[in-house]
């Protein structure tokens, strides 16, 4: 039996990845302390897959508690590590909290992987490691520039930590640098559940459209882009999820040529914030109430991916269009309005 540990399994990308893993024949256990997620999302996983997933509600920054997961699950053959704080703006305001949480948890998981002889590790990294690149699209060989936020620096440091660890203990790892995951599962049974005021663009759009937020801020209108707003590479969360399954199989089948490999996960299309708003308005039929604001600390000007390597080596091909991303995100927001009690969390109060 091939069991995969997914840390942060109750989170947005983690839960979608669990679904994809199960649909591809894996057994899964989750580790998530639910400080920024909701364990009820695993009920949606069960509805979609017919499988119950156990979640260990532990703080991965505590080594002994982390070890207990592996002691109870000796059949774990791989780890996908999502668990981390991820809000760029918050990381600028609270950098030490980000360094402590994101790096301590990573180190503990890697120590356990070594102690319990688990050779396959997939790390949830980010395009923030590139900083403000000199040229776009970025390839995996694009030099890292200084990250614009503490969050980005934890990902830069995290990549180096993983690389050093697997080269020292002769294990294998893949670093997945993904760009901007959006959308929801096509079943509309699961999607993103922001805590507090949303930090990411699409939840801010959908919450404004449905009336949870009175107005949405577009941060910056003076960037050197086609309309003055930031450029990003938006990709459907299910495409991101499937890439993790492919990466894991790549390691399990010993296809990797190095101990630590890197893949970009993006569509390759750079879109401005205003273009995303326009796409949402066309799909939903809702005119969005937004206003322009100043630049936000930590944001890069423009970034999007060259994804040729993932296509060639992993056999990964993004299949969801921008229209599908906006459509599923909006349908999920409409459903979430009805399911508010199910996903109630102190941080959901956005007033």
Descriptions of predicted regions:
Residues 1-78, 197:
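N-terminal Rossmann/SDR dinucleotide-binding element
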Residues 93-96, 100, 104-111, 129-175, ...:
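Catalytic helix-loop patch of NAD(P)-dependent Rossmann-fold dehydrogenases
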Residues 58, 204-351:
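C-terminal substrate-binding subdomain of Rossmann-fold SDR/epimerase-dehydratase oxidoreductases
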Residues 62, 104-108, 120, 157-158, ...:
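Conserved cofactor-binding/catalytic machinery of classical short-chain dehydrogenase/reductase
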Residues 77-80, 122:
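N-terminal Rossmann-like NAD(P) cofactor-binding module of classical short-chain dehydrogenase/reductase
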Residues 37, 85-89:
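Active-site beta-alpha loop architecture of Rossmann-like, nucleotide-cofactor-dependent enzymes
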Residues 82-86, 125-126:
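Conserved NAD(P)H cofactor-binding loop of Rossmann-fold oxidoreductase domains
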């Amino acid at each position: 039996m091939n069991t995969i540990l997914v840390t942060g399994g109750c989170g947005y990308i983690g839960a979608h990845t669990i679904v994809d893993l199960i649909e591809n024949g894996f057994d899964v256990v989750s580790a998530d302390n639910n400080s920024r997620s909701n364990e009820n999302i695993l009920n949606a996983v069960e509805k979609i897959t017919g499988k119950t997933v156990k979640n260990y509600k532990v703080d991965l920054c505590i080594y002994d508690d982390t070890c207990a997961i592996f002691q109870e699950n000796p059949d774990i053959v791989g780890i996908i590590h999502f668990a981390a704080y991820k809000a760029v703006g918050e990381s600028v305001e609270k950098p030490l909290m980000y360094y402590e949480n994101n790096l301590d948890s990573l180190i503990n998981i890697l120590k356990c992987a070594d102690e319990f002889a688990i050779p396959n590790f997939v790390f949830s990294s980010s395009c923030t490691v590139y900083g403000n690149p000199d040229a776009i699209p970025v390839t995996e060989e694009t030099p890292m520039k200084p990250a614009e936020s503490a969050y980005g620096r934890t990902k830069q440091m995290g990549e180096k930590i993983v690389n050093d660890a697997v080269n020292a203990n002769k294990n294998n790892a893949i670093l997945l640098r993904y760009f901007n995951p959006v959308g929801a599962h096509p079943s509309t049974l699961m999607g993103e559940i922001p805590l507090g005021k949303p930090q990411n663009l699409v939840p801010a759009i959908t919450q404004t459209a449905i009336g949870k937020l009175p107005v949405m801020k577009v941060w910056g209108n003076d960037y050197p882009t086609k309309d003055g707003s930031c450029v990003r590479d938006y990709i459907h969360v299910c495409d991101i999820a499937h890439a993790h399954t492919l990466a894991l199989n790549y390691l399990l089948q010993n296809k990797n040529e190095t101990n630590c490999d890197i893949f970009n996960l993006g569509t390759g299309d750079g879109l401005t914030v205003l273009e995303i708003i326009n796409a949402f308005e066309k799909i939903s039929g809702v005119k969005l109430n937004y206003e322009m604001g100043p630049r936000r600390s930590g944001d890069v000007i423009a970034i999007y991916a060259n994804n040729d390597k993932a296509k060639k080596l992993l056999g990964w091909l993004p299949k969801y269009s921008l229209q599908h991303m906006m459509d599923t995100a909006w349908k999920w927001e409409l459903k979430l309005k009805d399911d508010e009690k199910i996903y109630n969390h102190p941080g959901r109060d956005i007033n």
